[in-house]
């Protein structure tokens, strides 16, 4: 340890310490070289300090508990283990490798969490939290309600049709009630766009015209059907005369006209 740590700091901050005086005033920190045997013997502490139990009186623990604490009888443990060792070593060389069955696997240790302990823990949890038992019941009721709603069918009161959604049933009921009525002729329709196409037949408006010819139509669906007549692909064929048509309606009209098997 440096000697600067052993110096006492002066009280006056302006005063500078004199280290030479401090060395003369503390002669016990100076040792003579080389050390002789007398100095070494004086530095060794007495036996009372090295072994305090020899000089201190017996404590309460030593007088009361120490006689009860006896060393472990290792010999008795060895004697208890010796029959097992003798039993294992008593097998002869013939039995050790011929006709001996393999040792059975060790039985599993009994689980500390048995069914009774689990049930008791659940009972304690339900007793501590009364609302805990209602949560599974509420979930079960919600699942049952969803299943009933999924299985529930909406029946039409005008016919025997059934629908899984209420919106689909309402759209179907419009086909019975026909709420869209024409103001000119009184004809009713289930959809407003159907009524709009019908009104054009009274006004003569035909906003949908064919780009290939001069024909025009009041409804877009009629224009779409007319465009198939301009197509090169005619997939509807008459089996009697092998004529092809672009629309199924034209094929039916051809068959109703009395096809004799030859083109006219």
UniProtKB/Swiss-Prot annotation:
Tissues expressing this chain: Expressed in a variety of tissues with the highest expression in kidney. Expressed in mesenchymal and epithelial cell lines.
Modified residues (Phosphoserine): 11, 82, 92, 96, 100, 104, 107, 111, 115, 119, 246
Sites of Phosphothreonine modification: 203
Residues carrying covalently attached carbohydrate according to the record: 112
Keyword presence, Cytoplasm: yes
Effect of residue 228 to A: Very minor effect on binding to KPNB1 and nuclear import. Strongly reduces binding to KPNB1 and nuclear import
Domain of life the protein comes from: Eukaryota
Result of altering residue 3 to A: Loss of interaction with KDM1A
Molecular-function GO term, any one: sequence-specific double-stranded DNA binding
UniProt motif Destruction motif: location: 95-100
UniProt keywords, alphabetically: ADP-ribosylation, Cytoplasm, Developmental protein, DNA-binding, Glycoprotein, Isopeptide bond, Metal-binding, Nucleus, Phosphoprotein, Repeat, Ubl conjugation, Zinc, Zinc-finger
Effect in UniProt of substituting residue 92 to E: Does not affect repressor activity on E-cadherin/CDH1 promoter
Signal peptide coordinates: none
Consequence recorded when altering residue 182 to A: Impairs binding to KPNB1, IPO7 and TNPO1 and abolishes binding to KPNA2. Localizes to cytoplasm and nucleus
Result of altering residue 11 to A: Abolishes PKA phosphorylation. Strongly decreases repressor activity on E-cadherin/CDH1 and CLDN1 promoters. Increases protein stability. Affects function in EMT
Region (Required for FBXL14-triggered degradation): 120-151
Sites of the Glycyl lysine isopeptide (Lys-Gly) (interchain with G-Cter in ubiquitin) crosslink: 98, 137, 146
Residues covered by region (Disordered): 1-27, 86-115
Entry's localization field: Nucleus; Cytoplasm
Effect of mutating residue 203 to E: Exclusively localizes to the cytoplasm. Reduces capacity to associate with nuclear pore importins. Unable to enter the nucleus. Does not abrogate function
GO biological process: aortic valve morphogenesis; canonical Wnt signaling pathway; cartilage morphogenesis; epithelial cell migration; epithelial to mesenchymal transition; epithelial to mesenchymal transition involved in endocardial cushion formation; hair follicle morphogenesis; heterochromatin organization
Region (Required and sufficient for interaction with KDM1A): 2-7
Post-translational modification note: Phosphorylated by GSK3B. Once phosphorylated, it becomes a target for ubiquitination by BTRC, the ECS(SPSB3) or the SCF(FBXO11) complexes. Phosphorylation by CSNK1E, probably at Ser-104, provides the priming site for the subsequent phosphorylation by GSK3B, probably at Ser-100 and Ser-96. Phosphorylation by PAK1 may modulate its transcriptional activity by promoting increased accumulation in the nucleus. Phosphorylation at Ser-11 and Ser-92 positively regulates its functions in induction of EMT and cell survival, respectively. Ubiquitinated on Lys-98, Lys-137 and Lys-146 by FBXL14 and BTRC leading to degradation. BTRC-triggered ubiquitination requires previous GSK3B-mediated SNAI1 phosphorylation. Ubiquitinated by the SCF(FBXO11) complex; ubiquitination requires previous GSK3B-mediated SNAI1 phosphorylation. Ubiquitinated by the ECS(SPSB3) complex; ubiquitination requires previous GSK3B-mediated SNAI1 phosphorylation. Ubiquitination induced upon interaction with NOTCH1 or TP53/p53 is mediated by MDM2. Ubiquitinated in a FBXL5-dependent manner; preventing interaction with DNA and promoting its degradation.
Classification via PROSITE patterns: ZINC_FINGER_C2H2_1 (PS00028), ZINC_FINGER_C2H2_2 (PS50157)
Record function comment: Involved in induction of the epithelial to mesenchymal transition (EMT), formation and maintenance of embryonic mesoderm, growth arrest, survival and cell migration. Binds to 3 E-boxes of the E-cadherin/CDH1 gene promoter and to the promoters of CLDN7 and KRT8 and, in association with histone demethylase KDM1A which it recruits to the promoters, causes a decrease in dimethylated H3K4 levels and represses transcription.
The protein's name: Zinc finger protein SNAI1
């Amino acid at each position: 340890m440096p000697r600067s740590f052993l110096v006492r700091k002066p009280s006056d901050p302006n005063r500078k310490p004199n280290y030479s005086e401090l060395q003369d005033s503390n002669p016990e920190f100076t040792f003579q070289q080389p050390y002789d045997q007398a100095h070494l013997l004086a530095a060794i502490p007495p036996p009372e300090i090295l072994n305090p139990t020899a000089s201190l009186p017996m404590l309460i623990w030593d007088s009361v508990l120490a006689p009860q604490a006896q060393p472990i009888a290792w010999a008795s443990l060895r004697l208890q283990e010796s029959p097992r060792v003798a039993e294992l070593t008593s097998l002869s060389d013939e039995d050790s490798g011929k006709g001996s069955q393999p040792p059975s696997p060790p039985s599993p240790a009994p689980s500390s969490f048995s069914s009774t302990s689990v049930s008791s823990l659940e009972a304690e949890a339900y007793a501590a939290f009364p609302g805990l038992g209602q949560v599974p019941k509420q979930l079960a009721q919600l699942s049952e309600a969803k299943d009933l709603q999924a299985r529930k069918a909406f029946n039409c009161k005008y016919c025997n049709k059934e629908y899984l959604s209420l919106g689909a049933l309402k759209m179907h009921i419009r086909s019975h009630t026909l709420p869209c009525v024409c103001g000119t002729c009184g004809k009713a329709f289930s959809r407003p766009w159907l009524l709009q196409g019908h009104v054009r037949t009274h006004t003569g408006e035909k906003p949908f015209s064919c780009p290939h010819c001069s024909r025009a139509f009041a409804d877009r669906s009629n224009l779409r059907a007319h465009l198939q007549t301009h197509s090169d692909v005619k997939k509807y064929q008459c089996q009697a005369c092998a004529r092809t048509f672009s629309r199924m309606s034209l094929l039916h009209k051809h068959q109703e006209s009395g096809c004799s098997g030859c083109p006219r």
